[in-house]
Amino acid sequence: MATSAKLMLGSGLCQKLSQLTRQIHMQPALMSSFRSSREVQELDKYPEVEVVANPPEWRFVERLLPAKTVPQPVEKPKYPSGWQPQKEDGSELGYHVARTKNHMVPVYLHTRFRGQRRITVVRRVQGDIWTLEKDLRAVVEQSRNGKVCATRINELSGQIHFHGDHVDVLRDYLKEKGF
């Protein structure tokens, strides 16, 4: 294949290409940006720089930087998105569902087996998980017109699994309760 390519290009052009490739491969360090950069000059030739510990313009830069933690939400009577802040710890009920670090209700939908199996998961449950499961199962069965809903409880990790897609129903119920 190489000999047929040489015949097609012609002998003069082939020689020029081989010389060019030899030059490139023989001197890779000369073509780097380090070698081609200018040498360091005396400090007098560089412009003066004033180092300021707290410049007044820094507040504009701080607004652009992301916050290290999620800020506490501003108290309002009603939020336009429908979000509600978490109320008290729910000690009178015997259980508590803690919000996530982004102040969201921890109800998730897991899809398995190419979307055929849908499982709703309630996480971050503290306290009497069995009572919460009974209350949530009653809400889900009421939304399903009395059909039985299979549940699974993981007491150690504080999770309740519901068979089916019940994210909206459970999230609305937990928001009503103040979690």
From Swiss-Prot:
Its main location: mitochondrion. It is found in: Mitochondrion. The keyword Membrane does not apply. The keyword Mitochondrion applies. GO terms for molecular function: structural constituent of ribosome; translation initiation factor activity. Transmembrane segments: none annotated. One of its GO terms (cellular component) is mitochondrial large ribosomal subunit. GO terms for biological process: mitochondrial translation. Keywords: Mitochondrion, Ribonucleoprotein, Ribosomal protein. Pfam families: Img2. Component of the mitochondrial ribosome large subunit (39S) which comprises a 16S rRNA and about 50 distinct proteins. Belongs to the mitochondrion-specific ribosomal protein mL49 family. PANTHER family: LARGE RIBOSOMAL SUBUNIT PROTEIN ML49 (PTHR13477:SF0), MITOCHONDRIAL 39S RIBOSOMAL PROTEIN L49 (PTHR13477). This is Large ribosomal subunit protein mL49.
